[in-house]
Each structure stands twice: as structure tokens, then as C-alpha cells.
Amino acid sequence: GKARLIQNLLAVVDELELALNAAKNTEGAGAVANGLEIVLKKFRDLLSGEGLTTIESVGKKFDPTLHEAVERIQCDDVAEGTILEEVRKGFTLKGKLIRPSIVKIAVPHIPESDDAKPIESGQN
């Protein structure tokens, strides 16, 4: 149905975003980047009009119903479970999850304890 079509269109949006980022980092590709931005905006507007909403992730608390964690990064600057980076955007369609955000989350730094070091037996 409609959800499947939108999921397929999201794959196209992902590819367009990758192409746009590549064009922005390529000297002399300004016109290509501008064209891609226009196409992406039209895609996003069309999908938004159908009820698609981007899930806000970075800086938010990890929610397993909306996010999929692919990496845990030791970080003491933010609360445990805070999303540090979004690898792929997630979306809801009229309030229902259509694609989870793929994210990297903060975990507390674990200091190495003396227990973790090998025990020396004293024998040679």
C-alpha cells in the first residue's frame, strides 16, 4: 500500500542526499548540487504532504520504539542513552513508525579496574 510506496521513495531520497553531499564536496559541481537540492525539496514536500514526519534524534533520549542503536560511544559529557549521532534518518507516517532512525548513543565511560588486569602468578 501507501506505506510500502513511501518506504521505497525514502530509499530514493537517501540516494539523492548521498549524491548531494558528494556534489557539495566536488569542485565545480555547484550546479549539480543546486539541482539535487531542488529535487530533494520537492520529494520532501510531497512526502510531508502524505503525512511523513522525520523523527528528531540527535540530542534526544534513545527510544527503542523509534531508534535502532548501531554503536555505543563512551561519553561522560551527556546523560546515558543520549543520541550523539544519526546514521540514517527515521520517519513516521501519520503517527506510525515507517522506518526507525539508526543512531549512535552515549554510554558512561567505564574506567579500567585492577580486576581487569591479568593476575601474575609469581612463577616463571
Regions picked out by a protein language model, each given a short descriptive name:
Residues 1-11:
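Charge-rich, N-proximal long alpha-helical rod segments
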Residues 13-124:
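Structured alpha/beta interaction-core segments
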